[in-house]
Every structure is written in C-alpha cells, then in structure tokens.
Amino acid sequence: MRLAFVSPLPPAPTGIADYTVDVVRALNGPHSVELFHDQTNVAEALPAPAFPVAELPVRAAASAFDGVVYQMGNAPAHDFMYGWMERVRGVVVLHDLVLHHSFARRYLESREALAYAADPSDPGRKVEADRAHQSFLSAIEAVYPGLGERLKDAHFNTTGDLLPYAFPLFEPALRSARAVGAHNAFMIEAIQEARPDLDCVRLAMPVPLPSLAEGTAAAFRAKHGLAEAHWVVGCFGLVTREKRIETVARAVARIAEVHPDVRLLLAGPVSDNVWLGDLLARTRVSGRAVVTGRLDDREFAAAIAAADAVVHLRYPTARETSAALLRVMAQGRPVIVSDIANQAEIPDDVVRRVDPIDEEGGLVRSLEFLRRHPEEAVAMGGRARRFVETSHSLARTLETYERLLKPPAPR
C-alpha cells in the first residue's frame, strides 16, 4: 500500500513524533510511506520522505494514497490536524483519549481570541473573540449537552484544571474518520461506546529490543557523575507534572535519609525548567538529581540501562499507552507504575503498582522493596522484557496496522 502519515516528526516535543518514526520503520518494505508535517524543521535521518502538510492534497491528486493515517494526540504539536482530518479523510490513530485541551486550543487560542487578549479595549476584537468562544461552546454542547459553560470556565481557571480529564472530548477528532486505532483496551472500549459505527483496532506499539554494548551503563553514569555505588531511580520521557515528579522527588528525599547513595535521574525533555528547578530545590534533592534534557535514541537507551529502578507514574492521565514505559520494560528494568485502568493489561508480575490514593507512601515502599531484593528486581525486569517482546514487537505492529488499514467491512 501507498500510505500518507500525518504526524509531528522529530524534533517536535511529543513522544508521538518518535513513535511515528518507529511505525514507519515497521511498515517499510511491504508498504511505501510518505510523511506530512506542520513544522519549520524536521530531523534529517527519517525513514521516509517528508513534506509540508499543505502538499498532501497535491500529492494525493497526482497519485492516490491507499490510506491516510493521522497520528493524533493532546499536545500542541498535533493541533494542526483538525482541519486536515476533515479535509482529507483517513484513519485516526488516537494516542490520547483526552483531547479536550487540544480541541479547546482551536478556539480559545485562535487568532481572534489572542488578538482580543492583546487589546481587550477593542470592541471589534471582542466580537470576533466572542464568536470563537461561542463556536467552542457549541462544539462542547454537541458532545456534552448542558455542560458547555462549565467546561469553558475550566479553561479560564475558574473551576480547576482536572475537569477536562473527566470530559475527554475526543469525538470531534473522529468525526470524519474511516476507522480508528488505539493502544489499550480502556481506550478501545470508550471509543466503541461513543462511535459503534467505526471499525476500531487495538494496535501494538513498535518497541525495538536494544542490544547495548558492554559498559554502556557505566559510561553513561561516569559521564553524568553517577558512581557505581549509587542506587539510581530513573524517570524517562517528557518531564511533566503529570508524571508525578514531585512525588518521586519526595520519595527519593525520604529514602536518602536512610540511604544517602540514592540518586534521581530525569532523562528526557523538560516541559518547564523553572518549575522543575523549584521542585527539586523545595524537595531537597537538587544535589542528588541528574537532569539530561532530550537525548537521542542511543543515549536514551544508555540512560535506561543506568537506572536501578524506574518510576513511571501518571495523574491525571489522558489514558494513553506510554511508549517510554514500554521502552524501559524492553530493556528489562524493574518499573513502578500507577495503578490505573488504562494500564490494567500489563501483567501484575511484570511491574509494581502504586495506588494513587497512597502515592508517595506506596512509592517509597516499592522502591525500598526493589532495593532490598535485587534478585526480584532483575527477575521482574526479565518478565517485563518478555512481555514487550511478545506484545509490542515490530512484527505485531505491522500486523495490527495492516488490520487497521484494510477496507472496512460492509455494515
């Protein structure tokens, strides 16, 4: 098949950009893929030719695509897709069930709304901004009747920032979809309930099993000031509040009172450097924390190998399946995760789970267990690697994507 993938691409600040590259590598050979983006620059070493998304209709007219695939998430890097999903129909791979923030930005951060915010004394700009806000209300009311005003208020910080997670607003992204794919059973069930008319396919994640040279972990530790004797707690991927970094930092601080050799490794792009710096200082772990920023694939794998235990918490959650978590598991590291519904399909003997109600206490106990029982940590990591190898291989990715892209059955 000749396929068009519409997606953010590296170095866009979303893990889905890297995911898209891995999927294309899995599809290359049996299929021909072209990439379409909305960025001023993209990485040079991509596995398929890349074009500005404005060229999609022209290239489709010159030689029809067998399928157009939209890689849709909640981050700002995906916002450009809304208009294109309606203009050029295709299948939608939904990475986040919660698209409320993304959809709201179409209106609340529109050109008209921003112009009014810059000059609220201009009555003409107010009229245009009100029109954009009214369009947002109408769109919400179409999905959640009677809740438009309340949900709009949430975006102006009058009702708190958690409310949008209870009203995911993913339906507009599927309005013109031919089919939809997602990566976990929780999302599949929610999508099928909202859109029983759509073919919905559960997709595997393309998670390669890296083979690292001997000494890779030691070299990474030496480069970043981590001694062999240090017990390293790692968090991987985009560093955000939702990853519960403050909880992790507090847990590390508590453990350090008894075990001063503990260190915290944060490997990945940082969403807000000021917030993170203040947090590490306030929790008294600045002197035992290493923050790497964005790493290339080789360095990211080395960072994972350098961790003795990995923490991957989420709250609130957009119900996504985390590629960073699966990459950690693929390298056989022992992982502690939040006990949330969209991760229920990960077997209990593969990870340790933390109840969000007792998040910090549960995390401290789990870290202490892994520290006291290194043999069980190694065994758990081995089970994690086998789970990823079975459930999220490149071959499984190819198989599930081909199922998504096949012509829909008559209804």
Would you name each region that the model predicts?
Residues 310, 330-337:
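Short hydrophobic beta-strand element within catalytic cores of glycosyltransferases
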Residues 276-301:
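Nucleotide-activated donor-binding/catalytic signature segment of Leloir-type glycosyltransferases, i.e.
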Residues 40-41, 236, 263-277:
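Glycosyltransferase donor-sugar binding loop
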Residues 101-102, 160-200, 207-209, 345:
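A short, active-site helix/loop in glycosyltransferases that binds the activated sugar's phosphate group
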Residues 212-226:
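A short helix/loop element that forms part of the nucleotide-sugar donor recognition site in Leloir-type
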Residues 238, 376-390, 397, 403:
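A short, well-ordered alpha-helix in the C-terminal region of glycosyltransferases
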Residues 227-243, 249-252, 265:
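Conserved donor-binding/catalytic core segment of Leloir-type glycosyltransferases
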